[in-house]
């Protein structure tokens, strides 16, 4: 999850990069309480590139989703920007890996991932026996790549002044 949704390159044992890393510098500015129009404008920006949008999904933190659930879609209707885990007809996926004040949008058919080669699963009851713990280690070769960069967009929410 961290590789797919982070806006910074994950370091360590991988060279994989998710779709939002290259979008940080060109992120669309959203207000502290993003409006329905702001969400729809970002959606239109992705759809205008020719992406059909059948697999579009919003990515944000639970805190950002809570703000959208409390933001009215328009004055007086009582309808909120995020209702039933959807914004502008698209599902909302929450993860802290996207980072606070970031909202991602992507058509995930253009971010394939797979496991390659042999998979080894090691059960190690000895290394941490003094701690009464058993280590479970799964070793796999994992890969992912962004097929169409235009299928993804990133918005940066302006933090509310205190």
Which sequence ranges carry the predicted segments?
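Long, contiguous amphipathic alpha-helices that act as assembly "spine/axial" helices in icosahedral shell
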Residues: 1-23, 48-59, 63, 92, ...
């Amino acid at each position: 999850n961290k590789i797919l949704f982070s806006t910074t390159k994950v370091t360590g044992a991988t060279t994989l990069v998710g779709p939002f890393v290259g979008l940080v510098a060109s992120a669309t500015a959203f207000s502290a309480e993003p409006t329905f129009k702001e969400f729809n404008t970002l959606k239109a920006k992705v759809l205008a590139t020719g992406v059909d949008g059948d697999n579009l999904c919003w990515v944000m933190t639970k805190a950002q989703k809570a703000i959208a659930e409390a933001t009215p879609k328009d004055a007086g209707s009582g309808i909120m920007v995020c209702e039933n885990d959807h914004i502008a007809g698209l599902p909302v996926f929450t993860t802290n890996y996207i980072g606070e004040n970031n909202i991602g949008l992507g058509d995930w058919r253009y971010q394939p991932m797979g496991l390659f080669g042999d998979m080894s699963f090691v059960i190690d009851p000895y290394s941490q026996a003094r701690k009464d713990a058993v280590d479970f280690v799964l070793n796999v070769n994992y890969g992912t790549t962004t097929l169409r960069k235009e299928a993804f967009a990133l918005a940066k929410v302006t933090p509310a002044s205190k």
